[in-house]
Amino acid sequence: MICKLSDKKNNEKVVLINIKGGYGVYQRLLDMGLVPGVTLEISHNHGFGPITISLKGTKMMLGRGLAEKLIVKEENNSEKN
């Protein structure tokens, strides 16, 4: 199912498929390693405030507005990184 990162729950693994936003947002996320095709795990998402994710063993916090610009899909066994 395709949705925004902010819609996912704790401990879910997802694959980033698109970034909605202007060049500045896109470049900032690319610099953080958030590129289409990368697998993320949601560490903390309580429905408000920032979201904590794990990316290749590194935890990072994203503001909710930024997380709403990330379009993700559920990870399948065949897509694990």
For the regions a language model picked out, list residue spans one by one.
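Short, surface-exposed secondary-structure edge patches
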Residues: 5, 29-33
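C-terminal structural segments of small proteins and small subunits
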Residues: 51-81
